[in-house]
């Protein structure tokens, strides 16, 4: 079993998440690691299958979320326009209302109940989504096409 890693950027909801962690560790259904600070996020993402982003002020593209998706992690986060764009449509139900701890815990519970095949499919879908939509090569080709079209129109 790959461990589940929850990254806490603030301590606001730490108590509820610790209680949630104890429930799963006691039943030994899975492993959930709560971490305040991670020295090497990339190494942690290679080992994990769930990445939780609890930063409510996330009105910019999060490189951490993109890295987590690219590493095949399911991303659970607060719902906002930016995060809806970062996550594949199939997984928008992993986005919860800001501060809605009950919904957050229900989402994590559902992910922890997934079998290995479902979890692997989720990871592959997330990875492919990032590679296809946030790839520098794809963006470069779109920019070249746009400039070519503009240059051609100007020349005519």
Where are these regions (language model features)?
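Acidic donor-binding loop of glycosyltransferase active sites
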Residues: 46-60, 73
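Short glycine-rich donor-binding/catalytic loop of glycosyltransferases
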Residues: 56, 73, 77-84, 98-99
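Conserved acidic donor-binding segment of nucleotide-sugar-dependent glycosyltransferases
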Residues: 89, 93-101, 111-116
């Amino acid at each position: 079993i790959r461990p589940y890693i929850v990254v806490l950027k603030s301590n606001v909801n730490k108590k509820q998440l610790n209680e949630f962690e104890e429930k799963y560790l006691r039943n030994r259904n899975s492993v959930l690691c709560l971490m305040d600070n991670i020295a090497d996020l990339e190494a942690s993402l290679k080992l994990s299958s769930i990445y939780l982003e609890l930063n409510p002020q996330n009105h910019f593209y999060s490189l951490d979320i993109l890295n987590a998706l690219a590493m095949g992690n399911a991303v659970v986060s607060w719902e906002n326009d930016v995060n809806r764009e970062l996550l594949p449509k199939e997984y928008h139900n992993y986005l919860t209302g800001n501060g809605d701890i009950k919904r957050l815990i229900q989402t994590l519970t559902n992910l922890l109940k997934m079998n290995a095949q479902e979890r692997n499919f989720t990871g592959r879908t997330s990875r492919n989504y990032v590679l296809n939509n946030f790839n520098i090569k794809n963006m470069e080709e779109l920019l070249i096409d746009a400039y070519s079209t503009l240059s051609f129109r100007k020349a005519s």
